Amino acid sequence: FFSSLKTINPTISRYAKVADIISYQVRIIKLARQTLQSFREANQFSVEEIEYCKKVLDALLDDCIQSVTELLEIITPDKLQMTDDERLVRIDKLYGDMQDKFTFCNVMSEDIGLLALQRLSEQIEINRSKLINGIK
């Protein structure tokens, strides 16, 4: 009986959420890179703000790696003693976690873009005001 708990049912490996979790990880990596690059190129943020953003995104990527590592343990034969139902429950939980991580990354990216635009707009207004008032 216990040896059967180490065997992986092929339907578990082909469970759609397994591929979706991997897909989320790829999307998060791409979005995190784009976000950090945009953050740096915006020229609206201090070195400290950029470092903070990098730390947050690095922590997010580390969490993603942990989730995918756990997924691989769940779907690799002889790694864990679990029933099929237990494996599906764990996969569903990992899927929800990856959805949350992607949503967080997406919202962070949008918020950073909005903040950069707000700061740029503010700088334009300051420059316009200086020009109108003859201030250098």
Language-model region placement:
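Early exported N-terminus immediately downstream of N-terminal targeting peptides
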Residues: F1-T35
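Extended amphipathic alpha-helical interaction segments
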Residues: I21-D92
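Generic serine detector
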Residues: S3-S4, S13, S23, S38, ...
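Long amphipathic all-alpha helical oligomerization modules
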Residues: L72-K136
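A structural signal for well-ordered alpha-helices, especially hydrophobic packing surfaces
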Residues: N9, R33-L36, L61-V68, M98, ...
